[in-house]
Amino acid sequence: MFGKGGIGNLMKQAQQMQEKMQQMQEEVAKLEVTGESGAGLVKVTINGAHNCRRVEIDPSLLVEEDKEMLEDLIAAAFNDAARRIDETQKEKMASVSSGMQLPPGFKMPF
């Protein structure tokens, strides 16, 4: 099924992939991504662990009448940043497993 040395080779590849995944997770944790809303009037920066690092609000939004709109923009900017981090994580995960020669139908445990 796996050919000469197939299972040993598969185990070696799995170990290499596990090491690459560990490195990738460390890299992603260090990433910072900024999401925006309201054409850049609100910016939220988060790290790879989805922790908010910074919120920037354009001074033009700091009036009492726009409080609800500002709250919505902050939430939208955070969601945009979270989506960007998720996309980056998926791209990095795909690059980790792309070089492996896996049997047809083999599913990775992540």
Swiss-Prot record:
It holds the Pfam family YbaB_DNA_bd. Disulfide bonds: none annotated. InterPro entries: YbaB-like_sf (IPR036894), YbaB/EbfC (IPR004401). GO terms for molecular function: DNA binding. Gene3D superfamilies: Nucleoid-associated protein YbaB-like domain. One of its GO terms (cellular component) is cytosol. It comes from the Bacteria. Keywords: Cytoplasm, DNA-binding. It is found in: Cytoplasm, Nucleoid. Binds to DNA and alters its conformation. May be involved in regulation of gene expression, nucleoid organization and DNA protection. Belongs to the YbaB/EbfC family. Homodimer. This is Nucleoid-associated protein YE3092. It comes from Yersinia enterocolitica serotype O:8 / biotype 1B (strain NCTC 13174 / 8081). The lineage of its organism: Bacteria, Pseudomonadati, Pseudomonadota, Gammaproteobacteria, Enterobacterales.
